[in-house]
Amino acid sequence: MFEAGGRFFVGCNYWASHAGIAMWRKWDADTVRADLKLLSENAVEVLRVFPLWPDFQPISRHTAGGQSFVEMRFGEQPLPDTPAGRAGVDPVMVERFRTLCAYAAEYRLRLIVGLVTGWMSGRMFVPPAFSGVNVLTDPTALKWEVRMVRHLVSELRNETAIAAWDLGNECNCMGPVEGNPDAAWAWTNAISAAIRVEDASRPVVSGMHSLTAFKENGLWNIGEQAELTDVLTTHPYPLFTPHCNLDPIHTMRNAFHATAETRLYGDVGRVDAFIEEAGTLGPSQSGDSNAANLMRAMLWNGFAHDCRGMLWWCAFDQDQLEETPYDWMAIERELGLVRSNREPKPALIALREFSRALDRLNLRTIPPFRRDAVVILSHEQDNWGVGYSSFLLAKQAGFDVEFATADQELPESKFYILPSVRGLRVIDRRRWLALLDKVEKGATLLVTSDGGTLQPFNAPFGVDIVWTAAPTEPVAVIGAGMELYCPVERLLKLSARDAEVLASDRDGTPVMTSRACLLYTSPSPRDRSLS
């Protein structure tokens, strides 16, 4: 499903139309079957589905004096001496999930199963036993999570509709891990290992969002998720993503947001990545016609950039539901591809047209994606802002990029870009010397500065830094047919040794230089500015 050169898949995230998150407690098999039939008829191929944690593992903690723990129970009933009971899992819910799998198989739908669904749409959902507990770091909670995951995977692994196991929905929202730098790794390792013990045949999907390129910037990071799972995921909503909620939803920056973020995750992680959740977040953010425009842009861009697949959030509107989070969160009520009256929205029609166009044109196989340059994300910068801007600027200049970080072995390329360097670390010495060695062997390197320190610098670039200072105004960049003004973090006074001066400020100080295959610009005018 996720293999290189495979079939680009389309679909959505699914909660039943009649009950949303309460679908397992308010089970209606006929409605679920009708939902899946409607989605299949509109070219939906893949559903991401969620066994809600407290419904599937409804355990309560029973204690004696001084709150000393005695046992877990189903309410007042002891846990049965069965595999399900020992895992704290309700077998009725497992059978309901099995029915969902059967309907999916009937309508040729593939399922991605989010196993630990403890966070959903702005609300926590945990068993009564773990109310008020940090379920990412508490060892007892983790023990029961592992037991549930192993039981569900063991019971459901023979269901042919299941294509992949997902750790859960945005599990990095389920609790803080800042007190222990390895807690995120430990939780991910425990759940992914539990899956693989019971089923090594299917890929393990991260299900996380908002990962960072470096661990120093966030304990949930691309590298460690890629180490422990097979497939990374993006949830690229402009409203919740820095630098993205600036333009109308259907314009260039938002049209490429999902693609840029997914390529960054996949490139830096060096594993497959796909668009697992996306959408406009409803009529408070965008009208139906522009939602359809965004759908088309994400689908065609995702296809062209080898993003493997795209799932919309979500299948059905939930505007008739009274439970939280729908009672709390206005923005969660009208996110579906289908209205409450079962009328398909323009976004679903756009998805259907895209899918049928691929089939009609025999384009289902994901084409190779050529990259012309490597963008190197460095320490002490806003990696997402710099990477996103670099991706867009490259598009405007007519070429495509792949991403790497300054602490990785770099892929071979004829063109490297080290954008918006800032801070005192930037790139470790051994990595910097290896990059300069690539330049000596014929590669081109473009460095843009946001006040960052590189060493050695003067000799390779053929310049001297005379002094630095705090800026008092934007820097002028004046060259052949060009004059623009750029805000900068630090003002650098340069003098050219043997570098060619491509642009200067109003005082004649070089601000853009070239020496052999090295290009340097002191004010990084556009590659971190998204406002």
Task: Explain the meaning of each model-derived region.
Residues G423-S531:
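A conserved amphipathic helix/loop scaffold
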Residues I331, E343-L358, A516-L518, S522-S531:
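Extracellular ligand-binding/catalytic regions of CAZymes and related secreted enzymes
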Residues A394-L410:
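A short, well-structured beta->alpha microelement
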Residues N293-P325:
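Substrate-binding cleft of secreted/luminal carbohydrate-active enzymes
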Residues N172-V177, H243-N245, E261-L294:
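Active-site clefts of carbohydrate-active enzymes
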Residues F2-T229, A292:
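Active-site mouth of glycoside hydrolases
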Residues I191, R370-A397:
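Short, charged N-terminal beta->alpha structural module
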Residues M208, L219-M252:
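Aromatic- and acid-rich polysaccharide-binding/catalytic face
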